Amino acid sequence: MLSERHELNKIALLELKKDVEETREFSSYFSKMADLLLYVNEIYDTKERTLEQLKQWNRIWYEEISQEQYAHSFGNPEFCTEKFGKEYGQIFAFLYAEMRSGFIYAIEGRLFDLVINNELFLEISNLFLSGEEHPQKIKHIVFDHMRDYSEDVFEYRIREQLDPELDFATKIVMESDLSDPDILYQYGEYISENEIDTLKFLNKLPQEEITAMAKTYVDGFHEGFIINNIDMSPKRSVNIRYTIGFEPVVREAVRLFSEIGLAPIIYRSGVSVLTRGLHKIGYVSSSPNPQYEYDHRYDQAIFFDNRFMKHKLECYHNAYEHYKDEAYVFAGPACMETFGEIPFLPENKEENLKLSKKQQELSVEFQIKASEIMNQYIKPEQRSFTIIAYPIPEIGDNFEEIFKEVRES
């Protein structure tokens, strides 16, 4: 059934390309968006992938929102608003950002997410093809889509955070030839010189130094149980959070965690408007453009209201109930963070979506209640936590010296 919907979506996108002039003054947007979705669908359909191909896809995909091209990108609310007016411009920029999550779905082979992404765009494009477009109609479609699929989306997201069987990233860490920096393109995340140079640097270190770094990290987590007198015997999994490029250390950490009975859970930070937060949680990479991410931090303003907040909490609770056994054996997060990034000073744009006062209150209420739900299933007094931080090459010419000082401290 999913494969049939996927094929129908590809046909519909090609039809849209043929009939795009019927969307009148919006034709440039819908033509571009159809191309974008056809591109990710083609990536999904390509089952045999070389590292060189993954690298090429990655560079093409992220180039469009790069700082050099962002001024004229449909992902830029300022540009979209200037071109299509505020009401349509904000919606189009939101939709563009949401469709960009399709690249990750294609790389990971997540057909369900790819299909529903395509279907959201096609339902909106049909309004314009039939001349029935109106901002409120589009917002209604977005609300219904997010509500209808949030149960599935949150169930998968909670599973990602609790189930070691979802091992997309774990396989990259454990099975790749880490001597080749191009393996980093397997993630689908933006790969900059930071990630490549970090991996190259770690590959030059003696194995005993890599092991020592991993041991410090793992021991810090393990000691949380010992110092706080927490029974670790029921625990079977640990969430490893890191910045791409640190795979040699992560691989060794996975081995050391396994020695104390913990399997790795490694998931990326959220990519859709339903799973993104203001802070990235999971494995991360450099941003292709921090301004783009800043511009879209409140995209949920399109549909977030009291009804949706309550539904989201219900979905969140149901997902934890579904994976309560996995939650019980979860030992906590082990975080490997970085420092030395070039400071980012955002530009506050009038055109960006913003939460209303009521939406802000609802967002705070959701965060509080979602934390309460999580703590019912993953009890704070029964889990550990550790955090360690290393510099990245962006810090400057003395990167290796600073790294050594941190390692030896």
Q: What do the predicted segments below correspond to?
A:
Residues 1-409:
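Active-site bordering "gate/hinge" segments
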